[in-house]
Amino acid sequence: MARLLQASCLLSLLLAGFVPQSRGQEKSKMDCHGGISGTIYEYGALTIDGEEYIPFKQYAGKYVLFVNVASYUGLTGQYIELNALQEELAPFGLVILGFPCNQFGKQEPGENSEILPTLKYVRPGGGFVPNFQLFEKGDVNGEKEQKFYTFLKNSCPPTSELLGTSDRLFWEPMKVHDIRWNFEKFLVGPDGIPIMRWHHRTTVSNVKMDILSYMRRQAALGVKRK
């Protein structure tokens, strides 16, 4: 009986996913660099079913939140909070985009066709369906990283000094601006310029407060200009 209980506990830990321990100085949020050359509108990506290429210029005039996601991570529960965030802030011009990635702890191992069923029946489960667009699985770091992630990372300083445990990170070469783990977030403004970058442990509620605060400041500046 004790062995069965021990095995059950071990399985629960494995299913709960893995989030790397805190190492080095971390910041919940970083403001992106000024004077960025180019915009996110120069890029695009294929939807998760592979049927449509969406140019990001389609989102011109919107605030766009880029999130690298994974189905078997200790942070996968953020999917539910991201759904709520999308619903709440869509009237204010926010669009969330999700990019599955298997480079952190191998926590997105399935094919593209398996990701949505996993979210629906396994994690978060309970019939969950994301209300924001997911794109094809791809790399966010390393030699084969998607070019728009190169742009985002070069536009914003990292939120942590250290990358983490190397045996849980699957890319080369490693660079100082690389994404540290699943569910790191970048906010891009209505002009296509990156604004903020959040650490993966920053709660979605804090991300929401930061976004709303920025929107209010921009609205106030607009009123002053008039």
Swiss-Prot record:
It comes from the Eukaryota. Its EC number is 1.11.1.9. PROSITE patterns: GLUTATHIONE_PEROXID_1, GLUTATHIONE_PEROXID_2, GLUTATHIONE_PEROXID_3. Keywords: Oxidoreductase, Peroxidase, Secreted, Selenocysteine, Signal. One of its GO terms (molecular function) is identical protein binding. Secreted in plasma. The active site is at residue 73. Residues 1-24 form the signal peptide. GO terms for cellular component: extracellular space. Pfam families: GSHPx. The keyword Magnesium does not apply. One of its GO terms (biological process) is response to oxidative stress. It is found in: Secreted. SUPFAM superfamilies: Thioredoxin-like (SSF52833). The keyword Aminoacyl-tRNA synthetase does not apply. Its main location: secreted. It catalyses: 2 glutathione + H2O2 = glutathione disulfide + 2 H2O; tert-butyl hydroperoxide + 2 glutathione = tert-butanol + glutathione disulfide + H2O. PANTHER family: GLUTATHIONE PEROXIDASE, GLUTATHIONE PEROXIDASE 3. Homotetramer. This is Glutathione peroxidase 3. It comes from Pongo pygmaeus (Bornean orangutan). The gene is GPX3.
